[in-house]
Swiss-Prot record:
Name this protein carries in UniProt: Regulatory protein RecX
GO cellular component, one term: cytoplasm
Principal subcellular localisation of the protein: cytoplasm
InterPro entries given in the database record: RecX_HTH_1st (IPR053926), RecX_HTH_2nd (IPR053924), RecX_HTH_3rd (IPR053925), Regulatory_RecX (IPR003783), WH-like_DNA-bd_sf (IPR036388)
Organism of provenance: Lactobacillus johnsonii (strain CNCM I-12250 / La1 / NCC 533)
Biological process terms in GO annotation: regulation of DNA repair
Function as written in the Swiss-Prot or TrEMBL entry: Modulates RecA activity.
Record keywords, A-Z: Cytoplasm
Family annotation (NCBIfam families): PRK14135.1
Length: 271
């Protein structure tokens, strides 16, 4: 039966080299050395050696995983992916995952809730974007949906307002309609559906006077009038009309600009 003939320390603290029948066999941690009572002269069967190697592999995988988790919460899938990249065997990785779940260090339900709450506190993503990100982290869809269901609309509105609050500063520069359209579009690209997006937009401070709308019409109108100055008068007016309509101004407002009621069009051409 194989016999341990030598045990030497490695440069790496807490690691030991095991020699069997005067040849290097494997290395172990100080914990394994003590738990398995590995001493010079100890006889080991081939089965014993395999059990020791497995225990070492499992222990190494667990330590790597715990170190990875020390920086921030992770999903089960993220930890498995990390261990795989570190060259850990599937068996050792699975053993580490099972241990971490038992120790409550890994829990996709808690992970999903923490991920969502962090976004609600400092992020700007809506439900769809968060759902997509959690799926990329390997969280099951039913866990994601259950976690999202726990969030009130008011909390989503706060996150949405962080995303679009600067758009509210465009009063007097863009039409009310364009401001709302721009805000809704931005919300939708960040995962807010139409209904939730409208709830967010309703919180924007868009209270203004007719003078603000008139100022926005003036700025956008002058911009368009100058842009199409190379066209003949008919085409120029048609293009300006289309431009202002696309920017949320009503037909009446557009007509008032083109008739010269807002600003003298001839004076614009002089500059």
């Amino acid at each position: 039966m194989p016999i341990i003939t030598k045990i030497s320390t490695q440069k790496r603290k807490g690691r030991y080299n095991i020699f069997i029948d005067n040849e290097y066999a494997f290395s172990v941690s100080e914990r394994t050395l003590a738990e398995k009572r590995l001493l010079k002269g100890t006889e080991l069967s081939l089965e014993d050696i395999e059990k020791i190697k497995k225990a070492e592999a499992d222990s190494h995988a667990l330590q790597l995983a715990m170190s990875y988790l020390s920086y921030q919460p992770r999903s089960v899938y993220e930890v498995l992916t990390y261990l795989n990249k570190q060259g850990i065997s599937p068996e050792a990785s699975q053993s580490a995952i099972e241990n971490l779940i038992e120790l409550n260090y890994l829990d996709d339900n808690n992970f999903a809730r923490l991920f969502i709450q962090n976004n609600l506190r400092v992020g700007k993503d809506g439900p769809r974007s968060i759902s997509s990100k959690l799926k990329q982290k390997g969280v099951a869809n039913d866990i994601i949906q259950d976690s999202l269901y726990e969030v009130d609309d008011e909390e989503w509105i706060e996150a949405g307002m962080r995303l679009i609050h600067s758009i509210g500063h465009q009063v007097g520069k863009m039409s009310y309609k364009e401001i709302k359209q721009k805000a809704l579009k931005k919300l939708q690209t960040h995962g807010f559906n139409q209904e939730l997006g409208e709830l967010v937009v309703d919180q924007l401070d868009l209270e203004s006077t007719e003078d603000d709308q008139l100022e926005a019409l003036k700025k956008q109108g002058i911009k368009a009038w100058r842009r199409y100055r190379r066209d003949d008068d008919f085409k120029r007016r048609q293009k300006v009309k289309r431009y202002l309509f696309q920017h949320g101004f009503s037909s009446g407002e557009i007509d008032s600009f083109l008739s010269g009621e807002v600003v003298n069009l001839e004076e614009i051409d002089e500059y």
